[in-house]
């Protein structure tokens, strides 16, 4: 078991940068610690709602006690002073999360004639790659205020769920590719005795690939495909 944390800083008169790295296999942190500092709103696509994530029965204990994670988190935060009242902030991040475990479950049901025993074994494995970038441009001059924030996040998920039930083996596999782009613009200025303001928010969510495949020894494969987009 291991956990590694590292950070580096660079400071100049008009530029600052903070880089951080975290890696470990003790607990899961990459997806929760990879925070969007400018837009904390969580987004869930139509495709995620439709297909959801394949999952198995889990042990009745905390996830950190049975899951075997491998997490990586890399982040760069920058601040650039372009002019006296103009700044550019940025965050570039990458999260990688892998989780796997083995779990077996046996149930016994009694009726008037005999006992029915259902024995199941699960070996879930999932990996997620999640890159992200956020940029914030701000002009806070005396007569004009302008702000523009651009955020983008991608998610690349692959998961498998091999299952053995009373000696019969089948496997579910899921692949999902999604991305999200959001831009928020606002400006305010004074002209004579009037104050003018303009605000614009645009967002796009794309899910070009969503696929679930069920492989079973005794039957043909079952495949479910979906994709979607929203504005």
Each PLM stretch: what is its role?
Residues 1-158, 172-206:
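Membrane-proximal, glycine/serine-rich, low-complexity loop/turn segments characteristic
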Residues 102-103, 210-231:
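Short, intrinsically disordered, charge-balanced linker/junction segments flanking boundaries
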Residues 108-117, 165-170, 216-223:
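Flexible, solvent-exposed loop segments that connect beta-strands
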Residues 160-164, 212-214:
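Short, tandemly repeated low-complexity microdomains enriched for cysteine and small residues
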